Amino acid sequence: MKSATSAQRPYQEVGAMIRDLIIKTPYNPGERLPPEREIAEMLDVTRTVVREALIMLEIKGLVEVRRGAGIYVLDNSGSQNTDSPDANVCNDAGPFELLQARQLLESNIAEFAALQATREDIVKMRQALQLEERELASSAPGSSESGDMQFHLAIAEATHNSMLVELFRQSWQWRENNPMWIQLHSHLDDSLYRKEWLGDHKQILAALIKKDARAAKLAMWQHLENVKQRLLEFSNVDDIYFDGYLFDSWPLDKVDA
């Protein structure tokens, strides 16, 4: 496998392998592919990379991922190019790669913000949480998540470092415009995860109010770890009870070392 900095990312290489498997076997439209776990073993890669490759193939219309039912072939013509889901380099990363970058960036932003935040900054964070609560209470499917974005942005702005704010804005924009993230996010039930993540946000805010930099860093890290695990759970196509432990993560004690 090539490195993530080569012309192709790992999930793109694996996507091409799965496409070749569909063509050469061959699997006809409507037929079910082997389970994600078997594909990972067959190609000697992690299930996370296979999962991202399947999302890419789903975007391109080659397969359909049915949660709890399996992976089904839609097109076996081989006419689709799997090099990239989008020509824009900002959209070229897989969703879990984006999450890992956010985890590294935003945990350190939260740590610094705990030392820099003013009273006005805390007020902005509280207002963002209130907006989140109103959006959650509306219970409308696909309702706005602007409160979520405003909360994370308020933390970045509390560093009073314009470069950190810009880095945050860019990472969020990449997420919003990333077709693989959008595809994965579409499999989620908003009401289930947004309530959990609102609770995470309250823990982060509590640490920031106390100016506890270590607690703020760890709370943000754990929040994005929870996001990652929820996405892994909901993106699994073999077992609806999969708990997401196959994605490598750093323990909290390593983060704070």
From Swiss-Prot:
Membrane-spanning parts: none
Pfam families the record matches: FCD, GntR
SUPFAM superfamilies, sorted: GntR ligand-binding domain-like, Winged helix' DNA-binding domain
Keywords associated with the record: DNA-binding, Repressor, Transcription, Transcription regulation
Top-rank lineage group of the source organism: Bacteria
Ranges annotated as DNA-binding: 36-55
GO biological process, any: DNA-templated transcription
Example of a GO MF term: DNA binding
Every HTH gntR-type domain range: 8-76
Function: Repressor for the uxuRBA operon.
NCBIfam families: PRK10225.1
The name this protein goes by in its record: Uxu operon transcriptional regulator
Organism: Escherichia coli (strain K12)
UniProt lineage: Bacteria, Pseudomonadati, Pseudomonadota, Gammaproteobacteria, Enterobacterales
